[in-house]
Structure formats: structure tokens, C-alpha cells
Amino acid sequence: MIQKRKRTVSFRLVLMCTLLFVSLPITKTSAVNGTLMQYFEWYTPNDGQHWKRLQNDAEHLSDIGITAVWIPPAYKGLSQSDNGYGPYDLYDLGEFQQKGTVRTKYGTKSELQDAIGSLHSRNVQVYGDVVLNHKAGADATEDVTAVEVNPANRNQETSEEYQIKAWTDFRFPGRGNTYSDFKWHWYHFDGADWDESRKISRIFKFRGEGKAWDWEVSSENGNYDYLMYADVDYDHPDVVAETKKWGIWYANELSLDGFRIDAAKHIKFSFLRDWVQAVRQATGKEMFTVAEYWQNNAGKLENYLNKTSFNQSVFDVPLHFNLQAASSQGGGYDMRRLLDGTVVSRHPEKAVTFVENHDTQPGQSLESTVQTWFKPLAYAFILTRESGYPQVFYGDMYGTKGTSPKEIPSLKDNIEPILKARKEYAYGPQHDYIDHPDVIGWTREGDSSAAKSGLAALITDGPGGSKRMYAGLKNAGETWYDITGNRSDTVKIGSDGWGEFHVNDGSVSIYVQK
């Protein structure tokens, strides 16, 4: 239950704005609204059935308007239960007996290929998760000369040089030389966090020819190249060549349509720019790519876009935090500020908007969960507006399976009507009425490419109310209803194209043609 403020509400002020039309990642000429789904959550069961779940869900996903899915890391991690963010062998997609298992947490390579085939047959694209920052689960240790650094300032060395035993020897005995004969050794990395000889955990910076932190990364903690495990050295030419080769192989082997880049702020920016370009050139495909640069600062994200020559998109982290704040202030958030400091307001064509993900869900390291009551409002905000490429979280659709008392319930019944609104009605010019601390709204006039298209949306974090909004002259005389089912009244669009639309307390309503 949200706390509501007593307020005299006046909704007559009209704020009109024209936003940049965003070409969709599906095709450059497609008239269909693109919608991405992150098809996993952190606590996806370790039952080896996830690729089968994805295949079985392909028709449903297409029907509700999902045009692309982001799959979890598909390669062998340091154990069968690893989510893929502790990558051991990027060439083992659940095909070889390694780390005590053939399958990954999610299933086998052939099952994944079958799932992708089913998705493609229904015009749903597939984006692979790319974890390039580090490697984990080495087969043996190696002697390395290293120094300790200050975790709060990785440029500050806090010890003399000494020998450590680092887990940096990757031989891949189960795969051998299949697909690649490249073996990883200490000189392919520039740091680690464990000395096996002393059984101590530190951040170790390696010594040796050319060894230093990659400098073109986030400046947090002095230099944020190091994150975890054995940190890959993208100043090493053999590493650069091998990783480009793998990216091309990965895209072709799974017929991928794009990528999600993990931990981008910890990886040399110019390398990521060149890596994306190399894969695009080799495959001849657009390979839509979105980078996870976790920073609640649009300026930092804009800097990353600049450093990578705008050849990638980024997740709109500032918008996520605005939505989280709006959900947690008991009706006290000024809804006129939802777009303040966001990527979608600065670079709408490069913003992947989202409400929740596997890192922000309850119990995770970046936990910043949007409260359940607000999620339908948040999804309406990212799914029915013209700017940004919106993403739906698996955990919001199907619920999360962790042990926190705050686990996310399935919101499928709330989200699917909003997806239907996006798929069938959210087209044409947009008019914004973001002019009140509680109740904000927007309309879409519709266009000729989608029959009966056009909509009017209202959301409020506090008291309900109404707004008079312009729906377009072409919609004059039509009767519109609330597709969410939250209100039973209908609205007749006047001869001047205007209508009076209503919303309940702490709720969302999306009106479309009957």
C-alpha cells in the first residue's frame, strides 16, 4: 500500500514535445516496435532445462510482441551451477566434458541451437551475452611476479614485488584444440585476486613486459580495469586477435543477431569498439550490441558511447534508478523528473531502457529493486513511448526463485497487456503531458502501418485523476478503453482529437481503440 498525499490536482497544462524517432534494432525499415526480453534471472534453476524452456516459449514470446531475447552466457563456467559470469571456456557451449559436466547450467549446445532455430522461425532475434573481462576456473596455477594494490585506488601499489601462484593456466583438456588451439597463460592477464601459495586474497597487479592496468576504462577506484578472477589483458596482441576470432565464431556458430557486453566499464573501450566492428564486418550482419556500463551518470555513459564511436547502445541505468526512486518514496517522487539525467533523453537511439535485471533483483550485488506496485507503471513508461529500445525482465514476467523475502512475483498478467499495447497501438507522433508531480501522461496518434493504432497513457505515483490529452484528429469519434483493465470506463475522442482520460490512485491506464 502506498501512502498518498492530499493534493488539489489540476491537469489542464499541456506540455507538448517532439522526440526523435528511433529506428528499431529488428531491421532499419521495420514498422514493428522492437521489444527485447532478458530471458533469465539470477536464480534460474540449475536443471539443464532452460534452453528447452526458451524453445517451448518461442511462439508465446512472438505472440506477445517480443522481437529479441538476450540469453545468458552460453559457455562453460567454472562449475555446472555457474551462471556464466565466471567463464572458463568460451568455446564450450555445453558440448565437452569439462568442469565435471557436459551441459552448462542452462543445457547443451544442441538444445540451445534448437531454441535459437525456433525463435528465428518466429522472427525473434537472439543476442548472446559476452563476458570478456575475466576468466575463471583455471586448470593450474603459474608463478607470477606481482604487487599488491589498494582496492580503493588500484594505481597505488601497497607492497614490494613478490612471487605468487596465480590461477592463470587454461588448457581446456576436455575440448583440446577443437575450434581453437589457443591456451591461456599468466602473460595473457594483468591481474588476479588470489595467491594459492599463501592462500591470501588481494588485488594483485602482474609485473612483466608491457604489464599495467588497461588505462581506457572507468576511473572509479583510480582505475577500474580489475573486477574479479584473472583479468584479461587487452593490451596483449594475441589476446586481441583470439578474442576477435572467438566473437566471429560465437556469432556464426549460434547464428546470433547481436550481443550484450558484460562489465563494459572494466574493459578497454577502444578494444570493445574494434571487437564489435570486427564481428560485424566478418558476419555481414548488423549485430545489434548493448553494453552494460553500470553507472548512474548519463555523462559517463555518454563518454563511453563517444569512446566506442557510438557503435553500441547502453543500458539506461539512470532511468532505472529514477524508476526505483519513484517506487520507493511513497508517492513523494516528482514524476516530472523521471527523464532527468537519462540516456533516453540525450541519446534515445542508443538507450536500452529497462526496469529490472539479474543484478538489481533482490539479493544481488547491485540490488536496487523497483517495488512491485510500481512495475506496471514503469513498464508502461518504457514500452508505450517512442524513444528507447525497451527490455522486459524474465524475473518480472515469471517471478524470481531466490530465497529473499522480497522475491519478485510473476507480473505476467500486468505486463502482457502493456506488451500488447506496444505491439499493436504504440505508433505515430507522441505528445507529452509530463506536467504534474503525480499524474503524468502521453499519447500516440497512431499511423497507417498499424490498423487502429494510437493510445493514451496515464500513470500516477499518488492520487488518481484525469488529463485532457490530444489523441489526433484521425482518431476523432473513436471509442477507447483501458487495455490494462484497471478502469472500466471508455473515452470518446472528440471531433477536435482531444479526450479526457482517467487513472486510479497509484496506477496505470492505457487507452486504445475498441
Swiss-Prot record:
CC per GO annotation: extracellular region
Cellular compartment(s): Secreted
SMART domains listed in its UniProt record: Aamy (SM00642)
Binding sites annotated in the UniProt record for Ca(2+) 2: D190, A212, D214, D233, D235
Catalytic activity: Endohydrolysis of (1->4)-alpha-D-glucosidic linkages in polysaccharides containing three or more (1->4)-alpha-linked D-glucose units
GO biological process: carbohydrate metabolic process
Residues with site note (Transition state stabilizer): D359
UniProt-annotated binding residues for Ca(2+) 1: N133, D225, D231, H266
The protein's enzyme class: hydrolase
GO molecular function: alpha-amylase activity; calcium ion binding
Secretion signal span: 1-31
Documented EC number(s): 3.2.1.1
Keyword Kinase: no
Active site residues of this protein: D262 (nucleophile), E292 (proton donor)
Family, per entry: Belongs to the glycosyl hydrolase 13 family.
Assembly information from the UniProt record: Monomer.
Stated name of the protein: Alpha-amylase
